[in-house]
């Protein structure tokens, strides 16, 4: 909780109100306790950001060779936690007359890969779950949207993503720079606010235009240059 406490302290010093609370996203009781504790502390719940995810690269391989235990653990972490976050938050939002739910998915939800079968499949489930929640509770003024980050320069990415992969992502981004954590934070803030009150069931891709490129484009450009 050290980093969370530091963030909460900074918010409080700047005139806001914040508390840091423990959560084990693999345990539904922990998720429920977090939401109940939040309501007990602040009186109500208007917004929830289900922001959790991850995988074990050594075990999350192709469909034949991946670890089956990692498949179940990955789904428990990446989508079950989101489902329970929605499930336990919605009744409180119903009492308030509405609310906003933001789920973090990933661009891996939309693209096949040679590895990370569990991660991509479970994050794809988050996209679908987001639409279902939006459809089921929209008439009660509860919105549900998702954010799909590309490669974002979080501390984990800075320290663990190989430099050649960072350079590769940058090469194929439509924009000339990497994404930063604030790019995700501002998107979530928009979806949490009334400025997005007519948006629901959507997944906002925050990925610098990396995936809009035609994968054959580099070869086509090289071919065209060779013909000159």
Language-model features: where?
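Active-site helix of classical SDR
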Residues: 86, 122, 130
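Catalytic Tyr-X3-Lys loop
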Residues: 46, 64-83, 98, 102, ...
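The beta1-alpha1 cofactor-binding region of Rossmann-like NAD(H)/NADP(H)-dependent oxidoreductases
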Residues: 1, 22-34, 68, 182-183
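Conserved mid-core segment of classical short-chain dehydrogenase/reductases
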Residues: 32, 55-72, 95, 115-118, ...
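Alpha-helical segment proximal to the catalytic Tyr-Lys
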Residues: 91, 135-139, 197
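C-terminal helical subdomain
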Residues: 146, 167-195, 199, 206-208
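Short C-terminal tail/terminal secondary-structure segment
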Residues: 111, 200-228
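Residue(s) in the substrate-gating loop at a strand-loop-helix junction
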Residues: 106
């Amino acid at each position: 909780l050290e980093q969370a406490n530091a963030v909460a302290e900074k918010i409080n010093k700047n005139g806001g109100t914040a508390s840091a609370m423990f959560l084990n996203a693999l345990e539904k009781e922990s998720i429920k306790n977090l939401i109940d504790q939040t309501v007990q502390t602040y009186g109500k719940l208007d917004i929830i950001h289900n922001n959790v995810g991850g995988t074990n690269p050594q075990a999350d391989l192709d469909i034949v060779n991946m670890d089956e235990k990692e498949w179940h653990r990955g789904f428990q972490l990446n989508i079950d936690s989101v489902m329970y976050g929605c499930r336990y938050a919605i009744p409180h939002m119903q009492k308030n007359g509405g609310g906003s739910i933001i789920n973090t998915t990933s661009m891996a939800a939309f693209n096949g890969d040679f590895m990370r079968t569990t991660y991509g499949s479970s994050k794809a489930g988050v996209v679908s779950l987001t639409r279902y929640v939006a459809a089921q509770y929209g008439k009660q003024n509860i919105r549900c949207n998702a954010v799909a980050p590309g490669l974002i320069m979080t501390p984990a990415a800075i320290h663990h993503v190989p430099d050649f992969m960072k350079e590769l992502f940058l090469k194929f981004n439509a924009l000339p720079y990497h994404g930063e954590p604030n790019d995700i934070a501002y998107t979530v803030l928009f979806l949490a606010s009334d400025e997005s009150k007519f948006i629901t069931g959507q997944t906002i891709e925050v990925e610098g235009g990396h995936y809009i490129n035609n994968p054959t484009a580099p070869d086509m450009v090289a071919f065209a240059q060779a013909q000159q």
